[in-house]
């Protein structure tokens, strides 16, 4: 819910993302008067109600669920392979592909302040854009403990999610640790229900850099700049 943020232009995300999917028992959509009656005017457009799992009468059990996912860039823009580095004429800069025709001759490149100039063939580098990105990896682990009788019951769940995106050097990462505890107790004519949730997220966001990548000279291998000094 970002309604409190006014017109700041900031999106603080969706609280539903903080819920471990393994904890979800059901998702219910409330509409109209029923939603407003329960949650007030803020629910005039409806409510998405997420119910987490609750223990029943069952023996003590411990379960584990895990998944691993890999992601890659599907496709990138095709770049021209006729003209090389420069702006109308050849230039030592690393961006701009409006220079002379590529002819395979040896050219200097990089900063003109280098004591020892770097050289490379004035040739088109294949797969330059695609090779900039890395394979994104995500692993998700959940451990749950359940136990219940007619009188008491408990469900405890710990979840760990770690994701590294497709940007190099782990520039875009997401880590989330969740712990949830839900229990109940029946004492005489009284029923007690308790729930607790803890969430910690560490997020590193990176700019897409796609515009900068498109301006990169087609004859300069991006990998050669990884240790550039």
Protein language model annotation of sequence segments:
Residues 9, 20-23:
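A contiguous binding-surface segment within folded domains or other stable secondary-structure elements
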